[in-house]
């Protein structure tokens, strides 16, 4: 599989969709990743709480433990809009998918109508997050076709009918499904 273990990467820009809950409102967030030449680093921007800043280490370690080699490249992650405070670990999965997409692992169309939300354990397993039902309900209203969430949140997510729910146990399971879209 491209990018799995050894190999060359087609570096570039990739964008995925996610969401966060602020008070009683769901705010959509675009997670953008750019992987390119420069001093090797993993930098995140976009009005981030400490939990979101900590995602950098969770994502890098989870990717490595899922078998993906992090390239020695400059990787910049932007969570937008910048005016919305990003809180919690809900962005771990979308950050990982955006980075892997920027590495050329997935086709661009793989995530165009999909919303991703979930925390990553260091072993690459998805951990439950709070607020999945309101996120899924708003994703449905916004026209998303599918929500990719932790398997442990799947029952809650399925309470919102009329939108496909993919409950995954691991980052690798998510990646394999997106590669074949």
Predicted regions and their residues:
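Peripheral, non-AAA+ core regions of ATP-driven protein-machinery
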Residues: 2-179
């Amino acid at each position: 599989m491209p990018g799995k273990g050894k190999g060359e990467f087609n570096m570039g820009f990739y964008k995925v969709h996610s969401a966060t809950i602020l008070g009683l409102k769901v705010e959509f967030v675009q997670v953008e990743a750019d992987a390119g030449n420069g001093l090797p680093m993993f930098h995140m921007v976009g009005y981030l709480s400490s939990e979101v800043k900590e995602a950098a280490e969770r994502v890098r370690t989870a990717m490595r433990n899922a078998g993906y080699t992090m390239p020695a490249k400059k990787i910049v992650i932007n969570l937008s809009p910048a005016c919305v405070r990003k809180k919690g670990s809900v962005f771990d999965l979308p950050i990982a998918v955006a980075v892997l997409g920027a590495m050329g692992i997935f086709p661009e169309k793989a995530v165009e109508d999909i919303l991703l939300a979930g925390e990553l354990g260091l072993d690459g397993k998805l951990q439950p997050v709070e607020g999945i039902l309101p996120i899924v309900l708003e994703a449905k209203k916004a026209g998303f076709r599918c929500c990719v969430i932790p398997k442990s949140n799947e029952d809650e997510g399925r309470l919102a009918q009329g939108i496909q729910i993919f409950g995954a146990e691991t980052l690798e399971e998510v990646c394999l499904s997106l590669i074949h879209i």
